[in-house]
Amino acid sequence: MKVTDKPFFDKIAAEVSPAIPAPTTITSDFFIKMQKLSLIEINEICEELGETYPKSIEEVQGGDIHNAWRIEFSNKKLFLKRNIRNKKFLEFEKYCLQNLRKYINQENLVIPEVIAYKNIKNIEILLIEWIDMHNFDQKKLGKGLGELHLKSAESNPKMFGFPVEGFIGTTDQKKGLEDNWIDCFLNLRIIPQLLSLKSRIFDKETINKVKEKIKSELLNHKPINALVHGDLWSGNAGMDKNGKGVIFDPASWWADNEVDIAMTKLFGGFRKEFYEEYHKIFPIKNGLKK
């Protein structure tokens, strides 16, 4: 059924949550609740999933880059993300999620399954598995991340970097592959970041000093080349109803596994048991804190 006729509105009104008023026109509270999720987009989603209409749509707060909703059909709940910036943020996220899922042990770590991706007139829509989050300890989260790093490291392409242009937040992540960690870290991450600041304090001489300092610090470092989440702060991780770790909103690349551990130290960090379980798989090396 095309989501453009009055019977569709009536049918939804009869079955959606009572908290949502019955729609009378397309400017009713029901569609205000959809926050610019257009009827054309809803119709495209339904056709992609082989569904006739959503049972309910509820806006989800928390992100500052995308709009998001929980969308429920008769037999499933999905998380819908929508972006209008025309920069392929969600296409990159889809790619990262699909690649990370190849290396997880599902007994300990969950990564949302990608259900569908659509680009409708430069508006991106990503549908992924909805996961109810709970407050458990972080043992399985730490163990699951360690297992992901270990399995990906065992089958990695022997190159550092990533084959597609990416993002961390709204910041571009340069694509490319290097055969060693120092060149990757400098050429694909540090130098592009410094150049993007366009500040006089980062002139050519200063950038060269930064390069030499990083080279000297990493010269004797022997990294584990793993597929990392890439943006693993506490807001992008949690636990499901079974106590399994959950990670989402990735900015993946092939990198030193310590990239993820360093990121977990931001904004309050993770719990003690997370690090204990992770370091059972990857023991702490000299210089980790540095």
Where are these regions (language model features)?
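Active-site Asp-x-Gly
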Residues: 177, 181-186, 195, 224-227, ...
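Short, Lys/Arg-enriched N-terminal segments with co-localized hydrophobic residues
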Residues: 29-33
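Alpha-helix boundary/capping motif
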Residues: 2-7, 12, 21, 25-28
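Short acidic/polar mixed-charge low-complexity motifs
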Residues: 51, 74-78, 244
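Conserved N-terminal boundary motif of the eukaryotic protein kinase catalytic domain
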Residues: 50-59
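ATP-binding pocket architecture of kinase catalytic cores
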Residues: 58-183
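An alpha-helical support segment within catalytic cores of ATP-dependent transferases
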Residues: 38-49, 153-228, 240, 280
